[in-house]
Regions:
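Alpha-helical secondary-structure segments
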Residues: 2, 29-31, 67-68, 96-99, ...
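Gly/Pro-rich hinge or "lid" segments in bacterial periplasmic/extracellular proteins
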Residues: 29, 42-99, 107-109, 217, ...
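Short, well-ordered beta-strand elements
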Residues: 32-34, 67-70, 79-81, 97-104, ...
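Detector for C-terminal structural segments
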Residues: 174-202, 244-253, 274-389
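Structural transition elements
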Residues: 190-225, 243-245
């Protein structure tokens, strides 16, 4: 915890959420006292960080963890092999499988072939085409759930003409999100209206999904008021390793033509997206999905505060920042929930992004196995998978 907080080091926290830690004391062998600089009722959620020995030299080559499996080997761009850890601390939740191999499948067109040939026993995030190819195959069970991420056309609020709220609102009114779902996922998925998805339950505001129902005439009027009566050109940057996002961008390109916006897709490597779009913020718009690392409202909404290093869309709203500071120190759960809902509503009202959906997640599992589970966060819990034949 001290290392995560930067205590006894150079003061730089390894984990941003731990920057609030003032000191750590151990009064006895079964107790740890953590003192915070200011109240933070969500801090417990951030204690789910990995426990890693201080002097581990190469975590990439020799990972250290505390889970039900232990690391065996890794072949870059090929596979990662894990085996059951017999000394796992949670004796009531031991893994069923003795060995798990994660294979890298570079060609999405080869997924179904690999499943049917026996090379793969399981594959997550099937496309609608892949699901259709496996639907009648009794050798596989298809599990349906939410992907638990916020897919959107993320807009750089600091560049023209997207720095004009009316332009951003026009884009939102121009889109037909149900058509996006129908065309890329056979209608599966949940339309959303802000940076929150249904699995977060009490924080989620479902009515925001209807805030920008398609209205072409209203979109044109907003563009006219913003000074773009004839539309404008828009570049949509998309990482080339996510076919669902590419497909979504292609549908949006066609829809935006109705209001005079000429959009073009720029596909980039994932590393380039991380450096140029996410880190350097050199983009106009991008279609990606953003998920949460923790089960807190802050996990999805903190990134849009004006000073956050994760605020890659350059969103800036003084009221939003004030609400965030307020929710950080609130100790009343009901008040926290209401504040987070206000923050979601501001993102929607400001059309910070063109929110689309929490994408459907379909998982193929060979019928020899069972036990697959969906969680509010995107994880692959292999410890729950067991063999039935």
């Amino acid at each position: 915890i001290e290392r995560c907080a930067g205590i006894n080091g150079d003061g730089t926290p390894l984990v941003e959420a731990f920057s609030n830690v003032d000191k750590v004391e151990i009064p006895d062998e079964s107790t740890i006292d953590i003192y915070l600089k200011e109240a933070d009722t969500e801090f417990l959620a951030y204690l789910t960080v990995a426990i890693v020995p201080e002097h581990v030299e190469d975590l990439e080559a020799d990972p250290v963890g505390t889970g039900p499996f232990h690391y065996v080997s890794r072949s870059p761009q090929e596979n990662i092999v894990l085996e059951k850890f017999s000394d796992y601390w949670d004796t009531e939740n031991q893994a069923y499988l003795d060995k798990v191999t994660f294979r890298i499948v570079k060609d999405s067109n080869a997924v179904v072939t690999n499943l049917k040939s026996g090379t793969l026993d399981m594959y997550a995030r099937l496309s609608s085409t892949q699901t259709a190819q496996l639907a009648e195959d009794s050798d596989f069970t298809i599990y349906d759930g939410g992907m638990n991420l916020v897919q959107a056309l993320y807009l750089n609020n600091a560049v023209e003409p997207l720095n004009n709220v009316k332009v951003r609102q026009a884009l939102c009114y121009a889109a037909n999100r149900q058509e996006v779902l129908d065309m890329i996922a056979d209608g599966k998925g949940t339309i959303i209206g802000s940076s929150m998805f249904p699995a977060f339950g009490k924080y989620y505001v479902p009515e925001l999904s209807e805030r920008y129902n398609q209205d072409i005439e209203k979109a044109k009027e907003l563009l006219k008021e913003a000074g773009y009566p004839d539309g404008f050109e828009l570049t949509i940057t998309v990482p080339n390793n996510y076919q669902q996002h590419i497909d979504t961008a292609q549908v949006l390109v066609e829809q935006l033509k109705a209001i005079g916006v000429t959009a073009k897709i720029q596909q980039v490597e994932w590393d380039s997206w991380l450096s140029d779009v996410y880190a350097d913020r050199k983009f106009q718009s991008t279609v990606v999905g953003v998920d949460a690392a923790y089960l807190t409202g802050r996990a999805l909404l903190e990134r849009f505060t004006s000073t956050s290093s994760k605020n890659f869309i350059n969103y800036s709203n003084e009221e939003y920042d004030k609400l965030y500071q307020q929710v950080k120190t609130s100790t009343d759960e009901e008040e926290q929930v209401e504040i987070y809902k206000k923050m979601e509503t501001l993102l929607c009202d400001d059309a910070a992004n063109l929110y689309i959906e929490d994408m459907a997640c379909e998982v193929a599992l060979r019928s020899d196995f069972a036990g697959y589970r969906f969680y509010p966060l995107y994880v692959q819990d292999m410890a729950k998978i067991y063999k039935v034949k």
